[in-house]
Swiss-Prot record:
Any one of the GO BP annotations: generation of neurons
SUPFAM superfamilies: Homeodomain-like, lambda repressor-like DNA-binding domains
Full protein name: Silk gland factor 3
Organism in which the protein naturally occurs: Bombyx mori
Gene designation: SGF3
Function (record text): Involved in the transcriptional regulation of sericin-1 gene.
Chief location bin: nucleus
Subcellular location as annotated: Nucleus
Residue ranges flagged as DNA-binding region: 241-300
UniProt keyword Transcription regulation, yes or no: yes
PANTHER family noted in UniProt: POU DOMAIN (PTHR11636), POU DOMAIN PROTEIN 2, ISOFORM B-RELATED (PTHR11636:SF89)
Coiled coil: none
CC annotations in GO: nucleus
Cross-referenced SMART domains: HOX, POU
Key words, A-Z: Activator, Developmental protein, Differentiation, DNA-binding, Homeobox, Neurogenesis, Nucleus, Transcription, Transcription regulation
Amino acid sequence: MAATTYMPAEMELGNIGGYHAASPRSAEPADMKYQHPLHSGGSPSPGAPVIGNPWTSLPPADPWAMHQHHAHAHQPDVKPPPAPHDHRHLQHAAHGWHAPVVSPHYGAARPSHCMEDTQCPCTNTICSETSSPRDPLHHHAMERDQPEEDTPTSDDLEAFAKQFKQRRIKLGFTQADVGLALGTLYGNVFSQTTICRFEALQLSFKNMCKLKPLLQKWLEEADSTTGSPTSIDKIAAQGRKRKKRTSIEVSVKGALEQHFHKQPKPSAQEITSLADSLQLEKEVVRVWFCNRRQKEKRMTPPNTLGGEMMEGMGHAHYGHGDVHGSPLQHSPPGLSPQHGLPQGAHTLAAH
């Protein structure tokens, strides 16, 4: 009896909503049939009776619903595209938006604040963008926080630089040795100045952060291989070999001095023959002559200037004595000729 009562209402609602009862559109599940009362309420008709939503009280075993499901199983889904349907929905909203009726078709992607706003009925695209979860924002925040955890602070860099300098000195390596070892082991060649500026915290924060892991790896390897000949020790030995000072014997140095007085600037052939005769390396002899010439330049100008000044002072002294008499005449009373000279000398001076 309930089915015969609702059949005319269903037919009338289907005709008012713009869809025939036998169309595939009406054969959709119940969540799409809530749109028919909305259209009937949005476009009032004088002869249409005002009734509630009959589909909400329809039992699951209703013959009409079973008939629609059976028709839907045999007929393809040819429902119209959503764009004209949205257009009709906006036209009905222009006539009057009486109550914020929640439609399952639109309420799934529409946020609560959009349903309360009667001035801006949102579409599915805009609502889906505004109702997007905050997980992407949280994800970006985590990405920004991740590098900050790995980036050392200025206090960490200062503490590591101090520790690195102490360990380097204790292990007996110079700053040049560390730079050479980094270039050989890790492929990044650093000068002694760079290592010095790192220890003094004079590099930029970005360069300090880049250099810290390399120095930390080198320090760990140096600590673990202390006491055994490794590649680091060989590299350090090569670095110290360049700074080795050559000690020359006294007899060899005398021969070099004699040759220097004869020829301060020997030619390449003379340097080679002299090195062979003294059993020295050619580079050692060449460097010795360079250093000896620099030493001569440092010593010669003061001696020359001093000799000229002494000669000038001597001429002025004698001229002063010729004009004003002997210096003995202007001597203090304690050193007067009467007290400082013998009697014979005083007699000769009187005559």
